[in-house]
Amino acid sequence: EKNLSVETLRGIAILLVVVGHVVGSGPGGGMKIDFPHPLRYLYVWIDYIQMPLFTAIAGWAYALKPFSASSGFGSFVRKKALRLLVPMAAVGTLYFLVQYLMPGTNNKGELSQMWRIYVFPYTIYWYLPSLFLIFVVQWWMDSRKWMDTPGKWAVCCMAALILSRINDVWILHEVPDLFSFKGALGQLPYFFVGVASCRFAVPLYSRPAVRHVMLAVALCGIALIQTVWFYPGKCASLSMLLYPVTLIPALFLLLASKWHNRFFVWIGSYAYSIYLFHGFGTSGGRIILKMMGIDAIVPILLSATFIATIGPVLVDKLLDRSGMLRMLFLGRK
């Protein structure tokens, strides 16, 4: 039986991803909104929580099933490759071609460079190989019982936290980001948080003092977000470096929440399909509205978000009718 609170968080997380993509990560993408528009400020908040929350939920779901080495590493990798890498290749190829052929889209690629989308991070699909690598790392650590107690988990999480902070600096800055391994390093601590919130829920959440400390540190994240917005430059870079320190307790508290909402639970049940296909809706929605002569920001934001959310749900239902299409584009048997 599904945990409705976590499914609610999953629905919220994927909606944040969609809205963030509609707005765009910078003035040159998405709706091409420049500073200091309020939607740019909104994106700073979305960017803070969207992927860490998505990753923590993935870790929580992984930990639901007790680890068993008897199933074998090969079997585990095949299942995760089917679920993550096959759709990455299929949907990524389709997205590349549509973006290349359709007028009015952002960041068109060259056909001669299409091979790169299977080897290096490509637009929103960077996350899928990153998550695949994270699953492989987690399986390997579990096979050696490195995370079967809170103490061992804390050591592993600290190591992951250090790796995430040195990610893309020093020597790593010069290393090609093959298979989105840098994204995996950046998201690894949050996956570990999800694992711990499932495996060690009683010692984590049973003490009020622990929860109070978590809340206090999590609230400091609000101050970091304001620094990133109001003091761009070195102060913002330092604040972003500290993001995981405030994000980790925030994620623990969110995963422990008991609130649920039927609408978000429903959206959450299609989260993976929405992630795979929402890029078509965000781009297509903006283009269609502009062709209709609609340039107002709010109608474009709401309409593109609606299309990018509901469209993939319809695509999911359509593809699910064919075994081959279901496997290629949704990663389901």
Give the ranges of each region predicted by the language model.
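Membrane-cytosol interface segments of multi-pass membrane proteins
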Residues: 1-163, 291-333
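Interfacial loop-to-helix transition and helix-capping segments at the boundaries
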Residues: 39-51, 115-129, 168-190, 224-250, ...
